[in-house]
Amino acid sequence: MTGDSRAALLAALALQAEWGADEALLETPPDRAAAPAQRRPASPAAPSAPSAPGTVVRLPTAPSALGAASLAELRAALEAFDQCALKRTATQLVFADGAEDARIMIIGEAPGGEEDRIGRPFVGPAGQLLDKMLGSIGLDRGTVRIVNVVPWRPPGNRTPSDTEIAQCLPFLHRHIALVRPERLVLLGAVAVRALIGGKDGITRLRGTWREVAIEGLDRKLRALPTYHPAYLLRQPAAKRLAWADLLELRRECVESCVLRNSEMRDSQDFTKS
């Protein structure tokens, strides 16, 4: 192989990685010399009304999402759901972790590589940091419920699209309605966009409580946005702000009797460990 051809192959590989491809799907290369099949020109699609920036448009989804009477039925409904293309590229469904009757629900973005391989949310480096963050205010996976907005890993760990979020959002709403938590913690911009919407980003919203309407619940839930642990790994200076958010979560839970003070150990600054 010449230097020029090797450089061309590396450039093509880098482009595929940028697009989100992270594995080869064909065992044999296609015959590019063969005549291409004739394709019928597609009819132009009708233009859709633009949505407001930062707003996720809800799409029609499987009725089993709203009809699930238990978490087991909800998981089965997700396993049977084929409208989200991410299911075809992911290794498996990453459903949830933690207590099924938790009073605090942690909502992340989407599974990464480790989560896709193991089948549990937040098990990679970001998950290890999340465990440390929860432990700093006396919580752990046995006292919270952990779930992602999108339960399948996007190729290349890219950010889920608004369409993918909208396809999975009814299942997230049903998950919340079945667990019936008292408080939500929204980790990162995707969770905020899915449940709060609007134009404001996570930097502006973090640390302030918002009310979120959930289908299937007769009351709004208070939700606290904060930084995603993966972001904190890339930007360690933001850990101080996340620590302030955790202290606010602890204060709210104790003062609102969501959790008794005895259920939450003394706070220990996770940024110093």
What are these regions (language model features)?
Residues A7-L10, L15, D22-N261, D269-S273:
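A polyanion-binding, active-site-adjacent surface
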